[in-house]
Amino acid sequence: MSKYETVIGLEVHAELSTNSKIFCGCPTEFGAPPNTHTCPICLGHPGVLPVTNKQAVEFAMKAALALNCEISRETKFDRKNYFYPDSPKAYQISQFDQPIGYNGWIDIEVNGETKRIGITRLHLEEDAGKLTHSDFGGESLVDFNRVGVPLVEIVSEPDIRTPEEARAYLEKLKAIIQYTEVSDVRMEQGSLRCDANVSIRPYGQEEFGTKAELKNMNSFRNVQMGLEYEVLRQTEVVSSGGKVVQETRRWDEANKKTLTMRSKEEAHDYRYFPDPDLVRMQISEEWIEAVRATIPELPDARQARYVNEFGLSKDDAGVITISKETADFFDETVKTGAEPKSVANWLMVDLLAHLNANNLVFADVKMTPKGLGEMIKLIEDGTISSKIAKTVFKEMVETGKEPKQIVEEKGLVQISDEGALRQVVVDAVNSNPQAVADFKSGNEKAAAFFVGQVMKQTKGKANPGMVNKLIQEVLNSL
């Protein structure tokens, strides 16, 4: 066991799903041609005046309330001064000493234990542009479409002690933000980004160690791997008598290690000052309560409902509710009359396996809740077997066809005619005298052999329960 304790704090940026930017009317649509969603305001031309997007403020309030934050009754925007090619104004409009939300928390669960992670602050700011570095010619290209897109930055307390806890925190945070529908939180499109501050210290020491900031982690898996590597690196440095240098490092996914980006000897002086072009905002109790009323059922409450109302295990309910899309699909399917535990099993096992195997996301699923509900009823009434249902399920997910249509087109109706199945069983028994002898000598596996033979002859369409019953009857009658 290491004699050093890990201390991790996370900074998460989530783009808000407003139709227009935070201080101008330019659209926020992802994937538009470079530099087509810009105007003099977001590009910082002289003489222009920004106007605050009210929906962005309310989305930030909604996220803050969902994360159990207190809301500042008075808040303002500040200029964060720095020069970088992706920031055309040479400053970023952010919030310094009066964030919109503060003193929040979320509960995470790791290895069956619940832990509360504090949230220092949640503040609004504008996004920067996107730089693309060319491998040839030494050129860097900048796309200003993203400049001015509203963000919330969510800063955790340094309460996280392991990379596993960091991943659990991110998954829970993403789920809560997704449930509020203020952001689509898609890391692959950059609408959710995470930086991590990590340090180590001897157990029992109150003072923090020297931290490194990790960037370029574009998935939760990479965040966990990057932190695991960095903790190991810092432990080796300190254990060998060296000192950890305060710096910014990036995760090199190809080589699975962190690399130095730049030294960070001391905190930047961004010379924050209140933006003179934007008025202070007074946030009334009535406004806060109006926003609070728009918050839907959140993951923890939904998980508890699934346990109490449908009898799901806490773990199964947690798997379903970690994604709003999956939870919504579950609810809609149950409304069709399908048995909740069956719905949960199909979603957790078969659907997730299909998505993972094909590198897909839930949005790629063409199956409808109504279709899944009908398929489960086909199993329950004996029209198809559970084995055949897997074939039907896969086609439903890929094509969106209704289950009855698939069953009819492929001739998948389960054979439950006892007379017809008895003849298949008798034929299998007559054709395999050695297996019969094995059964008679007490080898129960021989019965399973005959099940396989019958299923082979019926192309998997025989009713499994009836097949087992008939095999026992025929063999015991010999």
From Swiss-Prot:
UniProt entry tagged with the keyword Electron transport: no
Catalytic activity: L-glutamyl-tRNA(Gln) + L-glutamine + ATP + H2O = L-glutaminyl-tRNA(Gln) + L-glutamate + ADP + phosphate + H(+); L-aspartyl-tRNA(Asn) + L-glutamine + ATP + H2O = L-asparaginyl-tRNA(Asn) + L-glutamate + ADP + phosphate + 2 H(+)
Pfam families (alphabetical): GatB_N, GatB_Yqey
SUPFAM superfamilies: GatB/YqeY motif (SSF89095), Glutamine synthetase/guanido kinase (SSF55931)
Protein's GO biological process: glutaminyl-tRNAGln biosynthesis via transamidation; translation
SMART domains: GatB_Yqey
InterPro entries, A to Z: Asn/Gln-tRNA_amidoTrfase_suB/E, Asn/Gln-tRNA_Trfase_suB/E_cat, Asn/Gln_amidotransferase, Asn/Gln_tRNA_amidoTrase-B-like, GatB, GatB_C_1, GatB_Yqey_C_2, Gln-tRNA_amidoTrfase_suB_CS
Record GO terms (molecular function): asparaginyl-tRNA synthase (glutamine-hydrolyzing) activity; ATP binding; glutaminyl-tRNA synthase (glutamine-hydrolyzing) activity
E.C. numbers: 6.3.5.-
The keyword ATP-binding is assigned to this record: yes
UniProt keywords, alphabetically: ATP-binding, Ligase, Nucleotide-binding, Protein biosynthesis
Task performed by this protein: Allows the formation of correctly charged Asn-tRNA(Asn) or Gln-tRNA(Gln) through the transamidation of misacylated Asp-tRNA(Asn) or Glu-tRNA(Gln) in organisms which lack either or both of asparaginyl-tRNA or glutaminyl-tRNA synthetases. The reaction takes place in the presence of glutamine and ATP through an activated phospho-Asp-tRNA(Asn) or phospho-Glu-tRNA(Gln).
Subunit description: Heterotrimer of A, B and C subunits.
HAMAP family linked: GatB
UniProt similarity note: Belongs to the GatB/GatE family. GatB subfamily.
UniProt name for this protein: Aspartyl/glutamyl-tRNA(Asn/Gln) amidotransferase subunit B
The organism of origin for this protein: Brevibacillus brevis (strain 47 / JCM 6285 / NBRC 100599)
Organism placement in taxonomy: Bacteria, Bacillati, Bacillota, Bacilli, Bacillales
Gene expressing this chain: gatB
